[in-house]
Amino acid sequence: MVAAVRVIGGETPLARYVLKVLRDRTTGFPEFRRYVRIAGSILAVYIAGELGWVEEEVETPLGAKAKELAPAGPVYLVGILGASLPMVEGFASMMPEARIALVAARRVEEPGRLKIEVYYSRLPRMFDGPAVVLDPMLATGKTVAEAVRLARDRGASKVVIGSIIASRQGVEYISSLYGDTPIYTLALDPELDENYFIVPGLGDAGDRALGVEP
């Protein structure tokens, strides 16, 4: 099964404008961080359709009744540290009730291959609802795949992936493992370079969003 990929940049000019700002090498980190946050909010609008909702009746200030929607239960945002921090914030601004979990991983490069080592996670013992894995750059897909595995192993009722830019290679890797996991991204770029950066991409999202180069 091939994962369903929805490229939001093809659906709204606002996403393309956000991408323009983020891709521009002259964008400074305060503005970059701000637009990563906006990208998270845009993703929330689209990913919301994947989550469970129930109809609830409320009374308006005029004493009239109206039926609208509310989350069917807890929703978890699983952020990949650290560039995802403003992205998670943007998503949570649209769904303030969302619970936030974190996963941190490092690359371990070996001759001929790349491995991912998770060195920190703050996850519920068991998920009692859907999980949205958020990572600005879905490059090789290995870190995101590990976060998906952790969420599924802990009982997430559904897992959805949100990114700002995804590579075709990363999407194919996710599909090979979790073909039933939908992927939402503002852009789908064609390739990775020798350092596993997405091309054309936007550079190192972590350095640019946090303003600190390790």
Curated annotation (Swiss-Prot):
A Pfam family recorded for this sequence: UPRTase
Cofactor binding note of this UniProt entry: Binds 1 Mg(2+) ion per subunit. The magnesium is bound as Mg-PRPP.
Keyword Cell division among UniProt keywords: no
Top enzyme class: transferase
UniProt cofactor(s): Mg(2+)
Top-level taxon of origin: Archaea
Catalytic reaction equation(s): UMP + diphosphate = 5-phospho-alpha-D-ribose 1-diphosphate + uracil
Activity regulation details: Allosterically activated by GTP.
SUPFAM superfamilies: PRTase-like
The protein, known as: Uracil phosphoribosyltransferase
Organism: Aeropyrum pernix (strain ATCC 700893 / DSM 11879 / JCM 9820 / NBRC 100138 / K1)
Gene: upp
